[in-house]
Amino acid sequence: MSRKSTYPKVMCTQHPDSASRYISTQEEPGEAIEAAVVFGCDEYMPDYEGKATPYHQNVQIVSRLIEETDLVPGKDVFITPRAPSAVQENRFRQLMVMMSIAEANHGALEYSDVQAINEFVHPMTGTVREILDAQQHMVDVSELAKKEFGFAMEVPRIIPLIEDAPALLHAKELTENTLLAWKERFGTVPEKFRVFLGKSDSALSFGHVASTLSCKYAINGLSELNFELETETGIVFGAGTLPFRGHLDLKNAENFFREYRGIGTITLQSALRYSHEKGDAEALVDLAKEKLPEIPELFSAEEKEELVNLIGIFGTRYSLIIRELASTINRLSDLLPQQRDRLMHRGSGGYSRSAPDISGIVSLCRTDIGKELLASMPAEDLHLPRAIKFTGALYSIGLPPEFIGTGAALNEAREKLGDEACERLLTKYFPSLVSDLNFATGYLDLNVASRFLSGACFKEVSKDIEILHETLGLETHPEPSYRILLEMMQPELLQAGTSGNCMDEEVSQLVCSTLTKMGKIRKALG
């Protein structure tokens, strides 16, 4: 990178992906202390996005850090809330979170001259206007705090979270245009500016391979900005432990840090802290502090063009299958446990994730590839569950989503882009792909999966697996205990998957218990 990063290295988050532990909002301030003192994280993200987090949680965390530790919030450990989107949820909730940021900073400045909260995350970002409007709200709240309480704080800076594949492909342009417009609106340009890239939602919409390539395309573009602009850009990369959501765990750490060179901060989510072996999370934190940031790999114009066409091909093949599975995924996801206090899925306080606008990908793809991608998209939004439960549902029927569309897309890429493009995919663009798929084979059971799929859908999935075995030499090595649980629960799971949740309470509890046990075996809910 062009400059030495001074950003935090490990952001502890409140993602509900632990299979072994439910954590209430009342426990989360203590969790923040644990993140810093036990796990060694240098950043914690109170999460208000689609979540019933009390507004005063920011204040509680900052106060407890001051009272119970020797750590100085804003210096030794950073508190970086994720505020709700004014577009996807509502502006009132966003403003209330911003007021709590001001209150937390007011309390911290009574103990020291260090401001506790200096940044906040804005989810599902798609436009410059969203970013600037949210930043303006923070400016307005800061001015109100100064007027009403007589204290001046440095206005916390927004971290846009980019979560879908089309936006990831335009992350560089979005960031550059934001910084140019920032100067016009606020009169200055920030010295530092972080961008948060999400692996999970882009995988949900476009599949594992297209998601990974989109994230790497975004990392490449944002790294280029570090050489082109005065502002120092930093990258937060959000990843879970299963491959579909990023494959960030201790065993895969070497692959992960090589794959995503250029990022400056990782997320340490709940599954790694509570569902993996004791000591794994601490070891990964130490490793991240040692390695981050690594020098990014920059792609040529020709390589970027090839990446986009690969994204289009893999996204198409994934989308054609996933839309056939939507109803099954939704029914099964309802049976997976809630591990955090979520808002309702739909309504004034919650939201559902809908299909992204793919014009940003189609316009970059080769014409024939773009047309096929466009045609593969469902006519109506599928309203799929959040990424963790989406992933967990597919793992729970013996069909890890990493496989969906991947084999057919690999063959199609070879036909349309050539053998050399496929070779570059496996050796340069996504060298960890084979490792990811080998991990997922431990939870693959086509016999079980067939009971949830239509005949045509099962034929396509079987073809994917066959191609991957032949092309990549994958070896299926099912986890014995996992397979037993899959087989044992089939009648009840099939009922849940095809007939709605019309089961008595005793059977429902048995199904939920077994799904949770499977999550514990794979060390993540999803």
Swiss-Prot record:
It holds the Pfam family PEPcase_2. InterPro entries: PEP_COase_arc-type, Pyrv/PenolPyrv_kinase-like_dom. One of its GO terms (biological process) is carbon fixation. Its cofactor is Mg(2+). Its EC number is 4.1.1.31. GO terms for molecular function: magnesium ion binding; phosphoenolpyruvate carboxylase activity. It catalyses: oxaloacetate + phosphate = phosphoenolpyruvate + hydrogencarbonate. Keywords: Carbon dioxide fixation, Lyase, Magnesium. It is an enzyme of class 4 (lyase). Catalyzes the irreversible beta-carboxylation of phosphoenolpyruvate (PEP) to form oxaloacetate (OAA), a four-carbon dicarboxylic acid source for the tricarboxylic acid cycle. Belongs to the PEPCase type 2 family. Homotetramer. This is Phosphoenolpyruvate carboxylase. It comes from Methanosarcina acetivorans (strain ATCC 35395 / DSM 2834 / JCM 12185 / C2A).
